[in-house]
């Protein structure tokens, strides 16, 4: 292309005589011009290649930075989620520590309350009716028991009242069964010893009696008899 272009610009070069100084000088100038043009074209091609390489390198760099940015963003989101989970877990642990801090103490106090109640129940009713000092002492013991239970309640200890409810092995301890065809099976019909809970946890299960032979049991028995 460059040779054809040079020939088109200098159509008489081939007519020059190299032995003629003037023609030889013209040929030298033409050769210099040709070389300069080729060098300029080469530099332009190199510059274009370098520009393309720079563009490719920049594009690759941008792609790498975008990938790094995505990875860092993902790491940041995971770290934020972990921090939030840690905050919630710590908050829950602190709340549990506050709620259940008195668990062992409360359990011991319930034993004391049980002893006070047994002492009161051991006093004959006729003795209370005839002995004023004994009656006064019994009233004092009862007030002490009541105040103790109220103090425990202020610290999150609640009395379980399961009578009439379905038996729950997490909060109740079955001591005996009571035949009762009018109630569904495993209904709490009697509380032998009060149970207590603190927060969502059982502090002491209620000792109870549960019904047996209710409607469901009767239906089952009927089915068994029919099969027999």
From Swiss-Prot:
A GO molecular-function annotation: protein-folding chaperone binding
This protein's UniProt keywords: Chaperone, Cytoplasm, Stress response
Pfam family, any one: GrpE
Region (Disordered): 1-31, 209-228
Any single Gene Ontology cellular-component annotation: cytoplasm
GO BP annotations, alphabetical order: protein folding
Entries under InterPro entries matching the protein: GrpE, GrpE_coiled_coil, GrpE_head
Signal peptide boundaries: none
Major localization listed first in the record, in broad terms: cytoplasm
Localization per record: Cytoplasm
Family: Belongs to the GrpE family.
Quaternary structure, from the entry: Homodimer.
Purpose: Participates actively in the response to hyperosmotic and heat shock by preventing the aggregation of stress-denatured proteins, in association with DnaK and GrpE. It is the nucleotide exchange factor for DnaK and may function as a thermosensor. Unfolded proteins bind initially to DnaJ; upon interaction with the DnaJ-bound protein, DnaK hydrolyzes its bound ATP, resulting in the formation of a stable complex. GrpE releases ADP from DnaK; ATP binding to DnaK triggers the release of the substrate protein, thus completing the reaction cycle.
Name of this chain's protein: Protein GrpE
């Amino acid at each position: 292309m460059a040779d054809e272009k040079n020939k088109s610009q200098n159509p008489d070069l081939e007519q020059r005589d190299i032995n003629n100084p003037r023609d030889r000088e013209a040929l030298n100038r033409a050769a210099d011009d040709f070389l300069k043009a080729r060098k300029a074209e080469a530099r332009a091609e190199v510059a274009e290649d370098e520009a393309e390489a720079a563009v490719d390198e920049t594009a690759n760099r941008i792609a790498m930075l975008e990938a790094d940015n995505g990875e860092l963003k993902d790491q940041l989101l995971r770290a934020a989620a972990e921090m939030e989970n840690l905050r919630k877990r710590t908050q829950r642990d602190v709340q549990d520590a506050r709620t259940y801090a008195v668990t062992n103490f409360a359990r011991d106090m319930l034993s004391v309350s049980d002893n006070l109640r047994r002492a009161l129940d051991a006093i004959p009713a006729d003795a209370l009716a005839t002995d004023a000092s004994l009656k006064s002492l019994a009233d004092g013991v009862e007030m002490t028991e009541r105040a103790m239970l109220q103090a425990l309640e202020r610290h999150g200890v609640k009395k379980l009242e399961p009578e009439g409810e379905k038996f729950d092995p997490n909060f109740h301890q079955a001591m005996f069964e009571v035949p009762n065809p009018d109630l569904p099976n495993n209904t709490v019909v009697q509380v032998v010893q009060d149970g207590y809970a603190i927060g969502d946890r059982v502090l002491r299960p209620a000792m109870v009696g549960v019904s047996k032979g209710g409607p469901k049991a009767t239906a089952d028995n009927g089915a068994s008899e029919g099969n027999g």
